[in-house]
Swiss-Prot record:
This is Novel acetylcholine receptor chaperone. Belongs to the DoxX family. Residues 136-167 are annotated as: Disordered. The keyword Membrane applies. May interact with NGFR. Interacts with RPN1, RPN2 and CANX.
Length: 167
């Protein structure tokens, strides 16, 4: 049976991956929701207006929206389907992307309800990355003492009068 850690990582990976595939697709095409697509277009226009540096670099709202959407779809697919290290790399890129989106929302002065989802999914991405990068805990296995393990007493052996003997 899989460990709880593995189940948690897989569940978070699939849920986050599907969410980002969905959100990235909304940024790329109006087929899923015309209203959400229109809202994304409007939001990205305000982001570019609020950050003139993007305009100077030749990045317009369409390019920004489509590049972020494509990155979300690609990383979401990796998070959902690809095993191993690429999943952690996709997680890291999505976390950076969420931080950039939070920056954009703050820059234009959006209320919390407009970017609460980004905050929650940023926290979930952070949790998934921390759980995935934490080494497996093997404390349940007994580690032999150096030398001959039978000759060395344990640290807390029972003494004859019920006292704990510490060596």
């Amino acid at each position: 049976m899989a460990s709880p850690r593995t189940v948690t990582i897989v569940a978070l990976s699939v849920a986050l991956g599907l969410f980002f595939v969905f959100m990235g697709t909304i940024k790329l095409t109006p087929r899923l929701s015309k209203d959400a697509y229109s809202e994304m277009k409007r939001a990205y226009k305000s982001y570019v207006r609020a950050l003139p540096l993007l305009k100077k670099m030749g990045i317009n709202s369409i390019l920004l929206r489509k590049s972020i959407g494509a990155l979300e779809v690609a990383c979401g697919i990796v998070m959902t389907l690809v095993p191993g290290r690429p999943k952690d790399v996709a997680n890291f890129f999505l976390l950076l992307l969420v931080l950039a989106v939070l920056f954009f929302h703050q820059l234009v002065g959006d209320p919390l309800k407009r970017y609460a989802h980004a905050l929650v999914f940023g926290i979930l991405l952070t949790c998934r990355l921390l759980i995935a990068r934490k080494p497996e805990d093997r404390s349940s296995e007994k580690k032999p003492l150096p030398g001959n393990a039978e000759e060395q007493p344990s640290l807390y052996e029972k003494a004859p009068q019920g006292k704990v003997k510490v060596s």
